[in-house]
């Protein structure tokens, strides 16, 4: 029979990683049953505040002989009991088992958990309705992600190869040869991506926490991902690695909405007009976007670096499509900008001094009159309006790789502009 297994919320900022636990289990269970595919790393709503780190759950599906099912389930629960970081207050693991074909109701729940806010009670209700078996540890919030990862319709996917460290190295600086990463990236880009930040000359594949992950390599071609990994040199042993199928970098979290429909923790694409000039606070750039249903504050936060320069070029009246997640900032609902597309830009007018009507020379301001620097001709001070080029193009602007959310699709990948342009088609 088909047995689906979902696990979530076993990690904490202090260590552990649900993918590590998942990779160990996948290897162990494969001795007892036949995997139908790679294990799946499913990222859920990135805006939820009580996520442990990247809000990623792990699912896997096996063809299991009926008499082996209890042994497989016991193995999963044993591993979670042994390896989850129960000491952290935000770590509330959940495990879900489901037998047979995935019903539509479970798929719908998965997409809701990706795009909106879902409660533990909702997850329990759906699990009971579809006949899934669930186990809660502590508060058991992890059953939301565990159930959602099982039901997730992975129509668009990428790959991530995760290499893990030997336990004695956990919590120490990772030893990854940066030059080898740049060389590997040059060979494999864009089939693998977000390996490096070419502007800062930094590598992005190695996390910085105390967790077991040594590196994570992302790509759209599994062969290239594996070959790229072989090209990277390490100054410490690799314990083992696991290739995951994942919804990372798919933009599947984004759904078109009107501004008035936006709720806290939504991920959405909206179309609207910039209603007033941008302002800055603490290196963050803000502006207001409105449509016929309402207004929302939009933010390009400091970590987005140069992306903020493009946001600063927006003017009141500009019509744009904006994509991002809704959070609360300073008590105000705020769209955390991931991408934007200028649909219609208003003319930019600057007022300039005219040329000297007598000799064509440059006029200089002298109180309430203008005086020609060349011939001395004087005239009343009157500036003339001149339309100047806008410094924004009709293209999608995105945050840099090190500020990109796990789910956000880079423009370098096929379909990187799809969600934004769908909004253009829907409302244009």
Swiss-Prot record:
GO terms for cellular component: cytoplasm. GO terms for molecular function: ATP binding; ligase activity, forming carbon-nitrogen bonds; nucleic acid binding. GO terms for biological process: tRNA wobble cytosine modification. Keywords: ATP-binding, Cytoplasm, Ligase, Nucleotide-binding, tRNA processing. It catalyses: cytidine(34) in tRNA(Ile2) + agmatine + ATP + H2O = 2-agmatinylcytidine(34) in tRNA(Ile2) + AMP + 2 phosphate + 2 H(+). InterPro entries: NA-bd_OB_tRNA (IPR004365), TiaS (IPR053434), TiaS-like_TCKD (IPR053870), TiaS_FLD (IPR013696), tRNA_Ile2__agm2C_synt (IPR024913), Zn_ribbon_TiaS (IPR055394). It is an enzyme of class 6 (ligase). Its EC number is 6.3.4.22. Pfam families: TiaS_FLD (PF08489), TiaS_TCKD (PF22641), tRNA_anti-codon (PF01336), Zn_ribbon_TiaS (PF23783). It is found in: Cytoplasm. The keyword Ligase applies. The keyword Chloroplast does not apply. ATP-dependent agmatine transferase that catalyzes the formation of 2-agmatinylcytidine (agm2C) at the wobble position (C34) of tRNA(Ile2), converting the codon specificity from AUG to AUA. HAMAP family: tRNA_Ile2_agm2C_synt. Belongs to the TiaS family. NCBIfam families: tRNAmod_TiaS. This is tRNA(Ile2) 2-agmatinylcytidine synthetase TiaS. It comes from Thermococcus gammatolerans (strain DSM 15229 / JCM 11827 / EJ3). The gene is tiaS.
